[in-house]
Design a protein with these regions (language model features):
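Conserved catalytic-core segment of nucleotide-activated headgroup transferases in glycan assembly
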Residues: 23, 146-149, 155-207, 211-221
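Extended catalytic core of nucleotide-activated donor transferases of GT-like folds
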Residues: 39-129
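Short hydrophobic beta-strand element within catalytic cores of glycosyltransferases
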Residues: 255-259
Length: 324
């Protein structure tokens, strides 16, 4: 099977620094392992070309490589460009036009299918009309971690290593960082706590607790993975739409601690975790640290599994969008 990818080709994992880049790189690797041939086409450039010209260029590229699908790994890509691009491609391309997003977009996105990381089926069980639209134009493929990067490492000391997630991007949103950092002062065992800030990956000073902002400054995936591979505990600090890093930490053997209502239920159920209150019970945490068990629980969440679910869709007939 041939697939046309909208976006940049990443040659090495060391080039990956963002969520979209992670999808682009890891999906490409998984597709290649499955025997899929990938061709790449540039993203739309507003002000440089018209939507009509871009559609023609994409269709020409798709025809030239006999593509069965056009896939944009960039998060909800076709909703970030003029709507007519996606709609024209859906109408004129015989194969699937697809994108990736956190959750269901019902039939609002100008694509044939949105592959979702989160399973939103439960949201529409009491609304048959919306449930039909959800099932027709969305498919849950789940989440994954690159097991070449995120895997169990043997510990060489008895230091409890804790990774505290970065503070919320939006400082006006609710964030548990300060309370969690203050809880570190109650630990009575040797430990090291690390976090992610605008200055990169840093060690937390328990004698000088402060919440340092993080505004999405890119950190190489290789560097971040090396940090998580050392962690016994990963602490969520704020509500997450996905919580992908939670899976990556669990792949490395970390026990996940989270305040209530910070992770989607289907995400949380897949990892060994504790829901914490304002006062963390460190005795219970330490008793539940089991790196081998934590890693074993999430081993099935691979990029190959996600690629396989997408390919299952691409070999079927795509649905009609009618006049949408």
């Amino acid at each position: 099977m041939n697939i046309l990818i909208i976006g940049r080709k990443f040659e090495a994992i060391s080039d990956v620094k963002t969520y979209t880049e992670m999808w682009a790189y890891n999906l490409a690797c998984a597709f290649s392992e499955a025997g899929v041939t990938l061709q790449y086409h540039r993203p739309y450039s507003p002000g440089v070309e018209s939507p009509e010209d871009y559609v023609e260029a994409v269709l020409t590229a798709a025809t030239a490589c006999s593509a069965k699908a056009i896939l944009a790994p960039g998060l909800r890509y076709f909703t970030t460009v003029p709507r007519e691009i996606g709609m024209q491609l859906c109408r004129r391309f015989s194969g699937w036009v697809a994108q990736v997003y956190d959750g269901s977009m019902l039939d609002s996105a100008p694509v044939d299918i949105t592959f979702t990381v989160r399973d939103d089926t439960w949201r529409y069980l009491d609304n048959p009309g919306r449930l039909e639209r959800h099932n027709r134009f969305n498919k849950h493929v789940g989440w994954a971690a690159n097991q070449d990067l995120f895997h169990l490492e043997t510990k060489t000391d008895d230091v409890l290593r804790i990774f505290v997630d970065h503070a919320a991007f939006d400082v006006s949103g609710f964030d548990h960082s300060l309370s969690i950092l203050m809880n570190l002062q109650r630990l009575t065992v040797p430990y090291e706590a690390r976090t992610l800030t605008d200055d990169g990956l840093v060690t937390i000073d328990p004698g000088n607790i402060s919440v340092i902002p993080y505004r999405r400054t890119p950190v190489p995936a290789t560097e971040f993975a090396a940090e998580l591979r050392k962690s016994d505990v990963f602490i969520v600090t704020h509500p997450e739409s996905l919580g992908l890093t939670v899976l990556e930490a669990a792949m490395c053997g970390a026990l996940v601690l989270t305040p209530p209502d910070c992770l989607p239920p289907d995400r949380l159920a897949l990892v060994n975790h504790m829901v914490i209150k304002s006062r963390i019970d460190w005795d219970e945490v330490i008793a539940r640290v089991d790196r081998v068990k934590n890693a074993e629980k999430v081993q099935c969440h691979t990029w190959s599994a996600i690629a396989e679910k997408m390919l299952e869709t691409f070999v079927t007939q795509k649905p009609s969008r009618g006049n949408g």
